[in-house]
Amino acid sequence: MHSYVVVTGRPGVGKTTLFWKVVRKLMDEGVVVKGFYCPEVRGQQGYRIGFKIVLLDGSGEAWLARREGCNGPRVGRYYTCPEAETIASRVLGELGKADLIAIDEIGPMELRLAGVRRTIYRVLDSGKPGLFVVHERLSDPYILARLKPSGVWFHVTIENRDVLPEKVYEAVKQAVARSKGVGELSL
């Protein structure tokens, strides 16, 4: 049985929109969802200046990467910000309270920071059901070894992005139900 639901696809295709549709619906139904997301941040002229890491419950955020002002390892045009590791690690303290762990995204930027990468590894090893948005070319062998055999994968395209939210929702709902030892999740 699948305990992880994985969403992937090209940049800009609608992965984050799908993620939020599913997460909001689950939260509205009383599912306790913990995790984080990494939105882009645009400057006054409209160009991207970096990314933040934000806890789903809104209780914390930090810069994940910026064009300037951070001193961590570089990924493309951005320098990672070590303070993101503290925010990511707070998810570990919430594992016991969560019905589902949701992360958007697991990609090069997030994995470049050792503390964020360790948090993701520990989440995957926790046995908690998860909804994960992953970079289309994710190549981390540790993560793939856990997601491939125990995950159901959805590849988002422009053609299917309008029908996938319900399919992803159903898959996540069943993963949560199985973790609670029930066949159907009645919310």
Curated annotation (Swiss-Prot):
Which keywords annotate this record? ATP-binding, Hydrolase, Nucleotide-binding
Pfam families recorded for this chain? NTPase_1
Which SUPFAM superfamilies does the record cross-reference, listed alphabetically? P-loop containing nucleoside triphosphate hydrolases
Q: Which reaction does it catalyse?
A: a ribonucleoside 5'-triphosphate + H2O = a ribonucleoside 5'-diphosphate + phosphate + H(+)
- Give binding positions for ATP: 9-16, 100-107
The UniProt GO MF terms for this protein read: ATP binding; ribonucleoside triphosphate phosphatase activity
Looking up InterPro entries in the UniProt record yields: Nuc-triphosphatase_THEP1 (IPR004948), P-loop_NTPase (IPR027417)
Keyword Nucleotide-binding listed: yes
Q: What is its EC number?
A: 3.6.1.15
Q: Which family does it belong to?
A: Belongs to the THEP1 NTPase family.
Query: What exactly does this protein do?
Result: Has nucleotide phosphatase activity towards ATP, GTP, CTP, TTP and UTP. May hydrolyze nucleoside diphosphates with lower efficiency.
Which named protein is this? Nucleoside-triphosphatase THEP1
User: Which organism's genome codes for this protein?
Assistant: Hyperthermus butylicus (strain DSM 5456 / JCM 9403 / PLM1-5)
